[in-house]
Amino acid sequence: MEIITDIAPLRARLRHEASVAFVPTMGNLHAGHLSLVRIAQKHASCSVVSIFVNRLQFAPHEDFDRYPRTWSDDCRLLEEQGADIVFMPDEKTLYPVPQEFQLLLPPVADTLEGACRPGFFRGVTTVVLKLFNIVQPHIAVFGEKDYQQLQVVHRMVDQLNLPVEIIAGETVRDEDGLALSSRNNYLDATQRQEAGELAHHLKQIRDSIASGERDFPLLEQLAAEKLSKRGWVVDYVAVRQQHTLLPVAASDSSLVILGAAWLNQTRLIDNFLLTLP
């Protein structure tokens, strides 16, 4: 496995590869990330994983400074997984001058995470587009856990005619249903025991809809109330159309149930997909 920190040597290394699959990460890798790497390895002759904590997608009051940085462990895991290249640029490499150019985002980025975290998707699309231009992958793999991010990236690729195929990797969960996330490391032992409740209530909504319930606002309200009673601070619980993330109409059959909530000082997000017959 090669560790590359600058743009020119990375491009030189990749120039003659028949196919390149790319997994962008912010590090602090876990089994969910490694599942994305395995998908990448199945689809291309060369797998590239980037590790970069992107300041642009953090608001000033958010956790940029304390976001877990575990570079040595990350590289060990990636080497064990058989990744070909780890791209680890520093901030001056990706942002040598102030980043003045940014994208005008589509409506799908305005709701849910976009409403709760203004500027988040602007930062995400900026760094992903820069990384796509640097790596020039044929395939890029993103996790379904960050479902809205996945939809935003899909639109960016489609509408800007970027020559990369986006592949989604399924969410990896612990035994209690908690979606694996680097921010799970913020949880203490007691909070970790409670953290699976978000997934539990979203899954309950999914199962209720699958059983015929169609009062979506009521399902959202009940789940949010149950979480609040357990001490969570809920940003949103929402049943949406999978591709547009708009509220569901009676004719929609492809749904996603999304939630974001705070457990003490840790913000967790999750989602479950549902396709109705």
Curated annotation (Swiss-Prot):
It comes from the Bacteria. Disulfide bonds: none annotated. (R)-pantoate binds at Q57, Q149. Pathway: Cofactor biosynthesis; (R)-pantothenate biosynthesis; (R)-pantothenate from (R)-pantoate and beta-alanine: step 1/1. The keyword Cytoplasm applies. Its EC number is 6.3.2.1. ATP binds at residues 26-33, 143-146, 172, 180-183. Transmembrane segments: none annotated. It is found in: Cytoplasm. The reaction proceeds by a bi uni uni bi ping pong mechanism. Catalyzes the condensation of pantoate with beta-alanine in an ATP-dependent reaction via a pantoyl-adenylate intermediate. This is Pantothenate synthetase. It comes from Nitrosomonas europaea (strain ATCC 19718 / CIP 103999 / KCTC 2705 / NBRC 14298). The lineage of its organism: Bacteria, Pseudomonadati, Pseudomonadota, Betaproteobacteria, Nitrosomonadales.
